[in-house]
């Protein structure tokens, strides 16, 4: 459960992304594909090479979904319901992959915003991404 401090940290951190969300989303996906090659199996129709239009496009979708989540911290299940249905019933993504992408997102954010990436912000963003992952996998049962 996100505390009031966590929510404030997430909103502040997300606000500092500016117009870089899609860029960071694509970078995190690229990191995931490179570091965890088995994740590529969910994207057989993608050119998963660095900087491809498909990776950039999906990175933008990831960033948009997380921006939506950051704006609805008190109702993540409601805000992400359609996305949860998609991943559970149509895409059938192995839940562990959300943890892998979350890790890559944290690395990407830390690399771009080292001064703002304090231990408290790191912990809050980690809890936020874990909460999003839990919501996205909640309909797998």
Swiss-Prot record:
The UniProt entry, under Gene3D superfamilies, shows:
Globins (1.10.490.10)
Q: At which residues is Phosphoserine found?
A: 3, 35, 49, 102, 124, 131, 138
Tell me which tissues or organs this protein is expressed in: Red blood cells.
Q: Which residues form the Globin domain?
A: 1-141
UniProtKB keywords: Acetylation, Heme, Iron, Metal-binding, Oxygen transport, Phosphoprotein, Transport
Write down the InterPro entries for this protein, in alphabetical order: Globin (IPR000971), Globin-like_sf (IPR009050), Globin/Proto (IPR012292), Hemoglobin_a-typ (IPR002338), Hemoglobin_oxygen_transport (IPR050056), Hemoglobin_pi (IPR002339)
For binding heme b, which residues are annotated in this chain's numbering?
87
Phosphotyrosine modified-residue sites: 24
Kindly list the GO molecular function terms attached to this UniProt entry.
Answer: haptoglobin binding; heme binding; iron ion binding; organic acid binding; oxygen binding; oxygen carrier activity; peroxidase activity
Q: Which residues are O2-binding?
A: 58
Q: Which GO terms describe its cellular component?
A: blood microparticle; haptoglobin-hemoglobin complex; hemoglobin complex
Q: Which GO terms describe its biological process?
A: hydrogen peroxide catabolic process
Tell me which family the UniProt entry assigns to this protein: Belongs to the globin family.
**Quaternary structure (record):** Heterotetramer of two alpha chains and two beta chains.
Its name, as the record gives it, is Hemoglobin subunit alpha
Q: Which organism is it from?
A: Peromyscus californicus (California mouse)
């Amino acid at each position: 459960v996100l505390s009031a401090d966590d929510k404030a940290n997430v909103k502040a951190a997300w606000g500092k992304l500016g117009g870089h969300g899609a860029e960071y989303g694509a970078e995190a996906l690229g990191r995931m594909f490179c570091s965890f090659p088995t994740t590529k199996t969910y994207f057989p129709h993608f050119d998963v090479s660095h900087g491809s239009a498909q990776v950039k496009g999906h990175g933008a979708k990831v960033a948009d979904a997380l921006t939506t989540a950051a704006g609805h911290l008190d109702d993540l299940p409601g805000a992400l319901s359609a996305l949860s249905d998609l991943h559970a019933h149509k895409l059938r993504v192995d839940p562990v992959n959300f943890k892998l992408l979350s890790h890559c997102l944290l690395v990407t954010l830390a690399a771009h915003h080292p001064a703002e990436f304090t231990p408290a912000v790191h912990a809050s963003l980690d809890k936020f991404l874990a909460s999003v992952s839990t919501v996205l996998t909640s309909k797998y049962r």
